[in-house]
């Protein structure tokens, strides 16, 4: 008897136009997955990422959605599944910062980061889990940060959002393990992206000095971990946190 062929998997990456999100899209495409590149405002960058994925021999689309809105997340997941006939992988990567010291931080500053980084992941995960549960297969990966583990001055909002992602994924992992759906978290350290490039030179130098490997990581380093957790062969790994930090958290 011939074994049934494994279907081509499809992935949705939020905040997929640039940085870690773009690298994740390309890494998953290199594994043969069709890719939905979500973006909020950078349409040209998202279309370029989708085109680069197609150059790797897969289907890819760019989908605009504001992950702060639950109805937009539901529609985003439905559109991604409709584009490819299924949805197997969700990467919650969309994130923002609004750094200020505690006494200067307003409620609006705090809410803006929580709404995108944490609530956006909740909304997308809830919508995707419904589909994945029915097909009895799914991989959900959220991009946290070492800041969510260790904290950082001037980032109470960001730290709270990234710590929240770890708890969110562990709880989802327990709820959906019996349905063939895994939920894991990656925690990047100091990674060279547009966000870190905007830091003062002295701050970047200090961050690099705190890394045992002596240098910042690349988006591709994080993407490799995401692709690992999104794969067929890692179905017995769930509820875990994988740090990609060059030893920074030791």
Where are these predicted regions, by residue range?
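The beta1-alpha1 cofactor-binding region of Rossmann-like NAD(H)/NADP(H)-dependent oxidoreductases
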Residues: 43, 64-76, 107, 220-221
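Substrate-binding pocket helix/loop in short-chain dehydrogenase/reductase
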Residues: 101-102, 106-114, 196, 207
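Short, small/polar-rich loop/turn modules that mediate ligand/substrate recognition or access, typified
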Residues: 86, 177, 182, 237-239
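Residue(s) in the substrate-gating loop at a strand-loop-helix junction
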Residues: 145
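Conserved glycine-rich cofactor-binding loop
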Residues: 10, 17-19
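Active-site helix of classical SDR
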Residues: 125, 161, 169
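Alpha-helical segment proximal to the catalytic Tyr-Lys
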Residues: 130, 174-178, 235
């Amino acid at each position: 008897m011939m074994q049934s062929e494994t279907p081509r998997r499809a992935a949705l990456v939020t905040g997929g136009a640039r940085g870690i999100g773009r690298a994740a899209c390309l890494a998953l495409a290199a594994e043969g997955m069709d890719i939905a590149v979500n973006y909020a405002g950078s349409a040209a960058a998202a279309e370029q990422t989708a085109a680069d994925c197609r150059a790797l021999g897969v289907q890819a689309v760019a989908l605009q959605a504001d992950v702060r809105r639950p109805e937009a997340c539901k529609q985003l997941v439905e559109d991604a599944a409709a584009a490819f006939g299924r949805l197997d992988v969700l990467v919650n990567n969309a994130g923002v910062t609004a750094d200020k010291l505690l006494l200067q931080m307003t409620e609006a500053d705090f809410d803006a980061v929580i709404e995108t980084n944490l609530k956006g992941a909740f909304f997308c995960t809830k919508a995707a889990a419904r589909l994945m549960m029915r097909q009895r297969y799914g991989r959900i990966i959220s991009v946290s940060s070492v800041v969510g583990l260790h904290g950082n001055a001037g980032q109470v909002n960001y730290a709270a959002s990234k710590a929240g992602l770890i708890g969110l994924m562990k709880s989802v992992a327990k709820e959906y393990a019996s349905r063939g759906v895994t939920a894991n978290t990656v925690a990047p350290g100091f990674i060279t992206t547009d966000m870190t490039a905007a830091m003062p030179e002295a701050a970047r130098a200090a961050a690099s000095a705190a890394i045992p490997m002596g240098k910042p990581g690349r988006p591709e380093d994080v993407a490799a971990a995401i692709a690992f957790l999104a794969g067929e062969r890692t179905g017995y790994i769930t509820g875990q946190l994988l740090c990609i930090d060059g030893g920074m958290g030791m």
